[in-house]
């Protein structure tokens, strides 16, 4: 490799690292049972939906505004140049939820063909497990991978609650 190529690669890696560690500002709306966040980058709009269930178990979902349908969708799209900032913001939102609501359980999932996204979400789950002293359980079926973080609660209670709300996850 030429010296210029190495320098370009290092600059690229540096910009990716910076974007991944620079979350966007999230505008939050909250009440006792929900925490809803909105953020945008360029002309793309995103929504984070966190809902509280029994035993202080929370779900965390991420949506992209599909401008063609004028509705939020869980299908991830948007400007690929901004993926790292969006992922950084998703991670930041998870930490905000944990710091604010101290959930006994946090449930989120990846539900598409992207293997990379599943790996990134798993790394988020591992970070949160260590940082906030959760236990982590993850399971995959077809294109769906669920991530369950829990503490201060019996796993059976978490699984029973998931069984009740599985259509909403």
Map each language-model feature to its residues.
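Non-catalytic substrate-recognition and accessory regions of acyl/acetyltransferase enzymes
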Residues: 1-169
């Amino acid at each position: 490799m030429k010296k210029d190529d190495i320098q370009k690669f290092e600059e690229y890696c540096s910009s990716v690292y910076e974007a991944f560690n620079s979350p966007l500002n999230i505008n939050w709306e909250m009440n006792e049972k929900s925490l809803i966040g909105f953020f945008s980058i360029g002309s793309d709009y995103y929504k984070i939906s966190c809902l509280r269930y029994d035993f202080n178990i929370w779900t965390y979902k991420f949506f992209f505004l599909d401008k063609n349908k004028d509705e939020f969708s869980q299908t991830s799209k948007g400007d690929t140049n901004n993926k790292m900032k969006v992922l950084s913001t998703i991670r930041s939102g998870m930490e905000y939820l944990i710091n604010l609501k101290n959930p006994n359980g946090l449930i989120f999932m990846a539900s598409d063909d992207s293997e990379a996204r599943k790996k990134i979400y798993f790394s988020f789950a591992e970070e949160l497990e260590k940082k906030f002293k959760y236990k982590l359980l993850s399971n995959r079926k077809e294109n769906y991978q669920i991530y369950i973080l829990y503490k201060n609660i019996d796993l059976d209670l978490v699984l029973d609650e998931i069984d009740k709300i599985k259509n909403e996850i």
